[in-house]
């Protein structure tokens, strides 16, 4: 029974942390995953969104900060107006807030996202 629960838990963790990987037009490459600060883990990804690509609504159990390398990121963030971030601009997503990133442009969107999230929790969870 415990083995089954461990397997199910692992599947749920993998599914929740691969929110981007399951969506058409979005590619994610993990650059770094490291424990720290205490009780947290730091994850750095580079993401590429094809024109028209859009994430599912989701949350993170910690802070997300990012930097747009190419294109324009349109970000819907719970409690804030929708904002477009162009190449060379940085953005921040509050812990636990529902948000959606999208590429409304005609060119590739590429950005770096750094998460500092609670250890042993999924890095990303679909929002209700």
Show the residue positions of the predicted features.
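Glycine- and acidic-residue-biased ligand/ion/polar-headgroup-sensing regions
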Residues: 60-79, 89
């Amino acid at each position: 029974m415990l083995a089954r629960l461990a397997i199910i838990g692992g599947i749920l963790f993998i599914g929740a942390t691969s929110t981007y990987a399951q969506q058409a037009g979005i590619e994610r490459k993990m650059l770094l995953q490291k424990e720290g600060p205490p009780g947290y883990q730091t994850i750095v990804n580079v993401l590429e969104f094809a024109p028209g690509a859009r994430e599912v609504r989701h949350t993170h159990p910690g802070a997300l900060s990012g930097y747009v390398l190419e294109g324009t990121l349109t970000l819907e963030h719970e409690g804030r107006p929708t904002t477009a971030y162009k190449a060379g601009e940085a953005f921040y997503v509050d812990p636990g807030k529902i948000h959606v990133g999208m590429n409304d442009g005609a060119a590739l969107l590429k950005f770096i996202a750094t998460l500092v999230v609670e250890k042993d929790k999924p890095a990303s969870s679909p929002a209700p």
